[in-house]
Amino acid sequence: MIKVTGYAAKHSYSRLKPYEFERDEAGAHEVEIDVLYCGVCHSDIHQVKNEWSNTVYPCVPGHEIVGRVTKVGPAVTRHAVGDLVGVGCMIDSCGQCEACKEGDQNYCGSPNSWLATYNGPMNPRAKAGGENIYGRDNTFGGYSNVLVVKEDFVLKIPAALRPEVAAPILCAGVTTWSPLRRWGVKAGDQVGVIGMGGLGHMAAKLARALGAEVTLFTTTPEKIEEAQKLGFKAVLEKDKQAFEKLEKSFDFILSTVPEKHDLNPFVALLKQDSVLAVVGALEPLAPLDNMSMAQMRRSVAGSLIGNLAETQDVLDFCAEHNIGPEIEMIRIQDVNDAYKKVEKGEVRFRYVIDMASLKEEIAGA
């Protein structure tokens, strides 16, 4: 067994604190990773606070992980000691269902769904034969110094990407990339992005690199200014005049807002046969005006993270096009304060934990 130190929440109202636990040694098809960086995702906060009612405690968050391979199992062929690698939201799936066979591990149809990098199976209450099919009820994520992961769920970090910049691409990047590719965004398309946070600004950068014309929708003048600094057109959500001018203008709209909000004003902006995809909010949204949708044959759809191939694809695309998230580096000791700032929308645009700060804490203990 490997002795590991991480930061964990013990219950829904607790601060993240140092937590010691053990991981299994790398098996035949697994790699051991020295964690270098881990992004802070809004879903980390949702899970720590049990806002989706599926958290298993103790909860060690973190699924935007970049590190270096330190050991490999005897059957590993995809990675070698010394490789710079990444781990995103998943560390396993059943591999047998139709979705998995098609390469869509993120839509695994097994009773437990896919195995999350932290907080156990995506559906921890489902049982197959009385037990979770993965043989475990909890998993611990990247807010820790060591990770052990099945080689197929480990991504290669391109040399052209700074490792700390690569970390958020493993969730925020692929979560926005997957719907952009699924609905065929291409050069010349008019694309709207709702929200100017960690996901929103990445979606805008990726869509622009695909050749689309991008408009960001946000809620404050400050965020309008931020969007313009990044070279994007931006519209205040409360500007009714601007919305009227933009009716039937967009080929695709992506909503990245991580909470309940009204999509109806944005549906009216879609052209005929166009799609508004939601990636930010997993809770119920405001009711949709089906008349507006039916009259123009518009669609509202959902999308959940991305599969492994899409994750490697977006990493490579970002490296090729020199794209990356805007990040702020923090020490792990400051993660609780970082959570508060994320909730207030004060981060520009993604916090990344320098895990050297955890190693310094361990060494000084």
Regions found by a protein language model. Give the residues of each.
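Short, well-ordered coil/turn residues at beta-beta hairpins
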Residues: 37, 88, 254-256, 355
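Helix-to-beta-strand junctions that scaffold the AdoMet/dcAdoMet cofactor pocket
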Residues: 270-271
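Glycine-centered, small-residue-biased loops immediately flanking beta-strands
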Residues: 274-275
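NAD(P)H dinucleotide-binding glycine-rich loop of Rossmann-like/cofactor-binding domains
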Residues: 94-194
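Adenosine-nucleotide cofactor-binding segment
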Residues: 187-196, 201, 205-263
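Glycine-rich beta-strand-centered segment in the early N-terminal region that forms part
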Residues: 24-38, 51-101, 105-106, 114, ...
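Rossmann-fold NAD(P)-binding glycine/threonine-rich loop
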Residues: 280-297, 308-314
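C-terminal hydrophobic helical "lid"/dimerization subdomain
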Residues: 1-2, 209, 308-365
